[in-house]
């Protein structure tokens, strides 16, 4: 494990962003609610983890059930598809197009409805615009699912670029939405570059979740979609968090959630960014004092976080806002997966994938080190917030790491829910 107190830490008004504040979060949540009839994801009180860590409270926002895609990414890519279609349809039709003119899935889920199966179909003019649009992106797995599912929902085409380390199960999870799959040799960053080249050449709409100079608007829309979960958290927590551990790949999720939390709970919690040791590009950037691309490293079990260059927008927000950066090992992620999946209390069971457990891994490692505990103020008054960003998106990998199937763990939690043990943690 590597730990770095951020030498550039300087929170204040300059660390905010108007597209990622509490007002933007409410707007994102309201837009999504007009398209999807979907309840908030649960906020689970982890009493055993809190006792193990010696802190006052630990809560985890469980995004594993978000819109049927098993990941928080369904808030970002699909949200940006909707925003981009609304803008393009308004431009082509010469009038402001409302979200009420978009299709509404009959199931309230991005995953379940067959193409064209909606409670409310799209306005014919808007549907024609959508049919002429192609959305393209690179992915480690989850963002591509969200873009592909969002494109299918509105009737557009999707082309998804995956690199060679994306597992067959994750590729199939994207392809089921009718997306055209393009394989790129190399890393996620190579897939990002190829998706940008092909989009420019083909006239496609590039929908990346990472930003670079000259390309920031769309990734910020993706990040704005993520803030909808903060809008929910603010209604679910009884007291403001003092600390939040957020894992990062390119940093878009971490920057969006941290920035929005600081808007909701000014002056906001201490923010600790957690990355895989093999792909700690944000930690390297903090050490260098500038956004830094690191060399491709060996693969990590935390595959959704295997990125080697921070998003420009994310880095600009996190550089002054993060209290500290951490890098954890694959074994730490497995320890966290087990802590979440196998507590003594059924009501605290959380199915967290290898990447979804990384923030929890950071908390467990920090609390086990007296010097880090002291540096972060992790004492019995601390109220820690975590986010499980994904459930078992690759069932075989999950079972191999944990020794238990995701289905078996889910059944245990379902039993607690049926017994009414989750009623206070999972608002309707």
Give residue ranges: language-model regions.
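PLP-dependent amino-acid enzyme catalytic core
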Residues: 1-428
